[in-house]
Structures are given as structure tokens and as C-alpha cells.
Amino acid sequence: MSSQFLLAFFLVLLVLGYEVQGAQGLQQDDPGSPALFGKVQESISSYWDTAKAAAQELYQKTYLTSVDEKLRDMYSKSSAAMSTYAGIFTDQLFTLLKGE
């Protein structure tokens, strides 16, 4: 799982690095101009979409049904245990505050 995260992280860094190299050759606008803000916003949005698409593609390539079922089962068991322990903790806290 960590290798997938690292791959996606380096992909995002690579895309951002190419943008920085390409942005150096562009004409410099006034820093306060709305056109520059729009360009930056559009650029960030396009990078986010690219990274999201790459992550989704990577997930679809490495999707394993058995692992997904195990993760869902582990999540349901752990959330049930946490709700039980949260109930016990709440009970103890109310008892402590009430002073019985």
C-alpha cells in the first residue's frame, strides 16, 4: 500500500516540476492581476484533476477483490469495537462526573 502512495506522490511531484519549468518561460504579469490569479487557479485545478485521474487509474490497476473484502471486514469489526469502547468510556466519564 505504501508503494502505491509513493508512486502517486512522485507522479504529482513530477507533474508539478514540469509546470515550474514551463512557467519560467511565460511572460510575467502583475502579481495582483485577476488574470494571473485565474491562471494559477486553473493550473492548480488541472494538476489536481491529473493527479486524481492517475491515482484512480493506479487503484483500478491494483484492485484486488479479496483485499477489498478483508479491508471492509476489518473496518466493520474495528468500528464495532470502537463504538463499544466509546460507550464504556462515556459511561465511566458520566459516573466520574456525577459522583456516584
Curated annotation (Swiss-Prot):
Any one cellular-component term (Gene Ontology): low-density lipoprotein particle
Protein family according to the UniProt entry: Belongs to the apolipoprotein C2 family.
InterPro entries for the chain: Apo-CII, ApoC-II_dom_sf
PANTHER family: APOLIPOPROTEIN C-II
This protein's name: Apolipoprotein C-II
Modification after translation (UniProt): Proapolipoprotein C-II is synthesized as a sialic acid containing glycoprotein which is subsequently desialylated prior to its proteolytic processing.
Entry keywords, A to Z: Chylomicron, HDL, LDL, Lipid degradation, Lipid metabolism, Lipid transport, Secreted, Signal, Transport, VLDL
Residue numbers spanned by region Lipid binding: 66-74
Record region (Lipoprotein lipase cofactor): 78-100
Annotated function: Component of chylomicrons, very low-density lipoproteins (VLDL), low-density lipoproteins (LDL), and high-density lipoproteins (HDL) in plasma. Plays an important role in lipoprotein metabolism as an activator of lipoprotein lipase.
Gene transcribed to yield this protein: APOC2
Taxonomic superkingdom: Eukaryota
GO BP annotation list: cholesterol efflux; chylomicron remnant clearance; chylomicron remodeling; high-density lipoprotein particle clearance; lipid catabolic process; negative regulation of cholesterol transport; negative regulation of lipid metabolic process; negative regulation of receptor-mediated endocytosis
The keyword Secreted appears for this protein: yes
Broad class of where this protein is predominantly found: secreted
Compartments in which it is found: Secreted
